UniProtKB/Swiss-Prot annotation:
Stretches for region Disordered: 18-52, 284-303
Gene Ontology terms: biological process: nucleobase-containing compound metabolic process
GO CC terms of this entry: cytoplasm; nucleus
PTM annotation (Phosphoserine): residues: 11, 139
Keywords assigned: Cytoplasm, Nucleus, Phosphoprotein
Basic and acidic residues composition-biased segments: 21-31
Segments crossing the lipid bilayer: none
Compartments in which it is found: Cytoplasm; Nucleus
Basic residues composition bias: residue spans: 41-50
Miscellaneous comment as given in the Swiss-Prot or TrEMBL entry: Present with 538 molecules/cell in log phase SD medium.
Record's compositionally biased regions (Polar residues): 287-296
Protein name according to UniProt: Protein SRL2
Length: 392
């Protein structure tokens, strides 16, 4: 959670400055020098000077009141085995476009430091890798800096790393897409910002802005390019977040340079020449089996066997486990059926920037949300079915 919950009067005065008492002094001088001044002018002056500071008071009281409301449930980190030195570990990122992090690295049980740090600690400890990056601040736009609080990454180091890599991954992909970089770059940054704010939602944190992504995109590309040219190789076994961040940045840069995105395992495709039709065809081809006469005969049987296998995997899960839903999601993520993978296809359309079909960015994001919600409903029904089976 953002450090803004500790926002007090002192920090408010440090940020906005103390209320000046010059209006009172000016009023006394006016009384001495001009005794015959009308009382209406005095009242008008005092009201004007106080209202200016009162507005700041109202802002402080209202914003601290909102910020002090704690979320009902703590934010959980989805645990997933990701070894940044292994390209296959990026399957989860490449299929959902969000990074989930695992506390265990390789075979060691080294727990990463998840203590709460200040935003400045995060900026200095994790992100300074030699390139002139500014990943921990807000936009360079002065108007935004004056009017809004600064955007902060999560204070949880694990979650913070996931957030940064997710945004960099999206930004690099869209930056290397011809349609994104030449035709509608502003929409690209806005799309990343809106999707990020939906996935990593925190009540007391200022949403990330498209301006912030735009201002830092060049630095991210430069950072990955420099590390790539140096032949930088890190050791992920140490559990050092800085090294993992460097490894991941190189991997993301190489993936973006190739201009490809993998949906599932070992299914690369070019963004510029790929749409939803080719994705659906790829899934259909992977499930289709032909017999000696050249007819598709066993597709239904394969689907039935696969569903039975998935069902058996889910039945082995512990219903009382608090991570039951996450474990079910891991099982379902391996299914290639269109009804369960539809949300991946929709997100892929966003990445390929197919913006000319009359749909706006918001409408496409709404489609993503609806599909994800539908998947969650399916999981709920599966759990109810399992409860019924166990009771029998």
């Amino acid at each position: 959670m953002s450090n803004f919950k500790n926002f007090t009067l002192n920090s408010f005065e440090d940020y906005y400055g103390k209320p000046s008492e010059t209006p009172k002094m000016e009023e006394e001088k006016l009384e001495v020098t001009n005794v015959n001044a009308s009382s209406s002018k005095k009242v008008h002056k005092s009201k004007k000077s106080t209202s200016k500071y009162d507005q700041k008071n109202v802002f402080r009281n209202s914003m601290t009141g909102i910020a002090q409301i704690l979320p009902t449930k703590p934010v959980k980190i989805i645990e997933q085995n990701i070894d940044f030195a292994n390209p296959k570990s990026f399957d989860l990122l490449q299929s959902t476009h969000t990074i989930c992090f695992n506390k265990r690295i390789n075979t060691t049980n080294t727990k990463l430091n998840v203590e709460t740090h200040t935003s400045s600690d995060i900026d200095n400890d994790i992100l300074h890798v030699g390139a002139p990056t500014d990943l921990g601040g807000n936009s360079n736009d002065e108007a935004e800096t004056r009017q809004l609080r600064k955007f902060r990454w999560s204070n949880n180091k694990e979650k913070s790393l996931c957030e940064k890599l997710t945004v960099i991954y999206w930004a690099l992909l869209l930056h290397t897409t011809k349609r994104a970089s030449k035709r509608r770059p502003i929409l690209c940054h806005q799309m990343i910002a809106e999707f990020f704010n939906r996935v990593y939602k925190e009540k007391s944190r200022v949403p990330i802005t498209s301006r912030y992504i735009r201002d830092n995109l060049v630095a991210w590309v430069t950072q990955g390019k420099e590390l790539h040219e140096k032949g930088w190789v890190g050791d992920a076994k140490t559990g050092d977040l800085q090294e993992q961040f460097n490894i991941a940045t190189v991997k993301l840069y190489e993936s973006a340079e190739d201009g490809r995105l993998s949906i599932g395992k070992d299914k690369p495709f070019r963004e510029e020449n790929t749409g939803s039709d080719s994705l659906v065809r790829a899934e259909e081809d992977s499930t289709a089996v032909t017999n000696e006469n050249g007819h598709i005969s066993s597709e239904k049987n394969l689907k039935k066997d696969r569903r039975e296998s998935i069902r058996n995997q889910i039945l082995t899960l512990d219903l009382n486990d608090e991570d039951f839903f996450q474990n079910v999601m891991k099982v379902l993520s391996a299914i290639d059926e269109p009804e369960l993978r539809q949300y991946v296809i929709v997100i892929s359309e966003l990445v390929s920037m197919e913006m000319d079909d009359g749909k706006t960015v918001r409408e496409k994001l709404r489609d993503v949300e609806l599909n994800i919600n539908r998947l969650q409903v399916d999981i709920k029904e599966i759990k109810e079915m399992l409860v019924t089976l166990i009771n029998k």
